[in-house]
Amino acid sequence: MTKEMRSFVPILINNGYREIRSNGSHFIYSNGNNQITVNKDLNKMVRRRLIKENNLVER
């Protein structure tokens, strides 16, 4: 798990997402309505895109 992924997980949790499963190199998070698939080798650019596309709040 990369540094970016370790810092992204708390953002997901603070926005109501929880890990529902992992398969190979991907983690699947859901908040009941939306689902986000995150690669374990997440990089900075993809992290920023996921935050923007899913309207996540960084706290």
Task: Show the residue positions of the predicted features.
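Basic nucleic-acid-binding interfaces
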Residues: 2-23, 28-59
